[in-house]
From Swiss-Prot:
GO CC annotation, single: plasma membrane
Name the UniProt record assigns to this protein: UPF0353 protein NFA_34780
Record flagged with keyword Lipid biosynthesis: no
Compartmental location: Cell membrane
Organism field: Nocardia farcinica (strain IFM 10152)
Domain VWFA: 90-295
Length: 335
């Protein structure tokens, strides 16, 4: 029963009263003992009284004092930090669908593993969250607008089609637009629901050029825009340094060449930093699933202060009742 705060702290002052009662009981017991020794016929007393009084004679008052302590804590209105499912939030999963996702360094392929882990992420999110799905290669597409229909999102993940080039910035900008559209449709609330973008990619941006950081469509520019809107972008760098794919030659002769497609941790780390999100890496299904599990905890739940007085109230009542019962069972009187 953890406590993080009290709503009526003044009631804890009653603990001083409990302490005075305990002190008074001790003083009364000592006074009675002295009076008994002073005025009693010791020969008679030794014959009729037990040689050593049972310590159980103090149990009733001890239990009732402890019960009063618990009841006092309950009266002070204790609260605790509680984790509760979010019932108002928007998340957009943004997935890289460039040709590099065909790489088999994460067996059976980056794409298949990303699809499997992505669908598990969808299933794991709490039902109150509106979840959307965006893909990007040379351009970005809204595969599923934010919705609470999890089956629709999983169907969209199953329908991924790979394409050339990588426009990471377009993916972020499209996700932002999707979030804003939902907020407009919902309306009514004084503040828009909290939102988060989860971006999974395996390579460096190629459209626009990765070095053209001032381009309004650049991923870094999009990340700064997300930051200004209060929408963090959590990024996942997925794959290994030794990934490669077969790329058809452009000469039309039917040939191909193997091209290395290593992951680009630095760019994705910078996107997360600029937007206020968090950066993760994954090079296997297990690692990607673990990342999504972490994000589910962060996104799907929020911490709030909740009333924690009931356990203390019940415990206090039980202990006081135990004190009364003990007093009835073990009360001793001299004959």
């Amino acid at each position: 029963m953890s406590i993080s705060h009290f709503t009526a702290l003044i009631w804890l002052g009653f603990l001083a009263v409990v302490a005075l009662i305990a002190l008074g009981y001790v003083l009364v017991q000592r006074s009675r003992h002295r009076q008994m020794l002073r005025f009693s016929n010791m020969e008679v007393l030794e014959k009729v009284a037990p040689s050593r009084p049972s310590p159980l004679r103090h149990a009733p008052i001890a239990l009732m004092l402890v019960g009063l302590v618990f009841l006092t804590i309950a009266a002070a209105g204790p609260t605790s930090v509680q984790k509760v499912p979010r019932n108002r939030a928007t998340v957009v999963l943004v997935m890289d669908v460039s040709l590099s996702m065909e790489a088999t360094d994460v067996p059976p392929s980056r794409l298949e593993v990303a699809q499997q882990a992505g669908k598990e992420f969808v299933d794991g999110l709490t039902q109150g969250i509106n979840l959307g799905f965006v893909t990007f290669a040379g351009t970005a597409s809204v595969m599923q607008s934010p919705t609470t229909n999890r089956e629709a999102v999983k169907a969209a993940i199953d329908n991924i089609k790979l394409a050339e080039r990588t426009a990471t910035g377009e993916g972020i900008l499209t996700a932002l637009q999707s979030i804003e559209t939902l907020a407009t449709v919902l309306g009514g609330a004084e503040t828009p629901p909290p939102a988060r973008i989860v971006l999974m990619s395996d390579g460096k941006q190629t459209v626009p050029d990765d070095k053209d950081v001032d381009n309004p469509r650049h991923a870094f520019t999009a990340a700064r825009l997300a930051k200004s809107k209060g929408i963090p972008v959590s990024t996942i760098s997925f794959g290994t340094e030794w990934g490669s794919v077969e790329i058809p030659d452009q000469d039309g002769q039917g040939g191909s060449q193997r091209v290395k497609v290593p992951v680009d941790n630095e760019s994705l780390r910078e996107i997360a930093k600029l937007s206020g999100g968090e950066f993760y890496t994954a090079s296997s299904l297990e690692e990607l699933t673990a990342v999504y599990d972490t994000l589910e905890e962060q996104i799907g739940y929020e911490t709030t202060r909740g009333d924690a007085s009931r356990p203390w109230l019940l415990l206090g009542m039980l202990v006081v009742a135990a004190g009364i019962v003990t007093g009835l069972l073990y009360r001793q009187r001299l004959p």
